[in-house]
Amino acid sequence: MEEEKRLGDRNDARRIRSVDGMHAYMTHLMPHRTDAEVYINETLDVTELLKFLETRNTPEAPFKTTIFHCVVMAAAKIVKMRPLLNRYVSGNHYYMRDRISLGFTIKRQFADGAGESLMMLYPEDSFTLRDFSRMIVGEVSEARADEAHGADGALENLKHLPRPLMNVVMGAIRLMDRWGWWPESLKRLDPNYSSVMLSNLGSIQCNAIYHHLNNIGTNGIVLTIGVAHK
């Protein structure tokens, strides 16, 4: 039976109350999210993966499975196996998320001037690669067909606000973000609150880059995937 939320918990996470002194001190030593960034670059051999995808993506397959789908599944499985990766720091406190989430941005069309859409995925523990592919393909198709998909409609409305009013709105958002008052219904649409945020740069023939965190939200892991080389 799932434990009930206590005072100090959040709508998407539970506060960790057994933090050691060193880690409690670090939240004050590095008060901003971008103070604590660490970068790493890894090269993976995908030879066998490409062979597997070639056998999976037959003409009869209902949808195409890609390297990106495999990386998304791997990220979810790693967080499941290493649950400490699903923690975040906000308001100088540590929290453990209630579930694993994956966020990314998609291009509506493969063109320089094409619009973009925010995407959030909430996989189940039992998901297979086929489940991940089906979910990603379905969500992407829906987002490309609906310009008001997810948080996109709200963002389109916000962009029309006068700059002084926008500053007031952003100040209120940052305050609610810090104290855990940001509605869970909005967090579910925003990759800035995901366990892992991904960027598939290989789709535009670009190598992987070092990507910064954003100074809002609770996302602490950003994963970029570059183009596959021989």
Question: Model-predicted segments: where are they?
Answer:
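C-terminal catalytic/motor cores of large multi-domain enzyme assemblies
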Residues: M1-K230
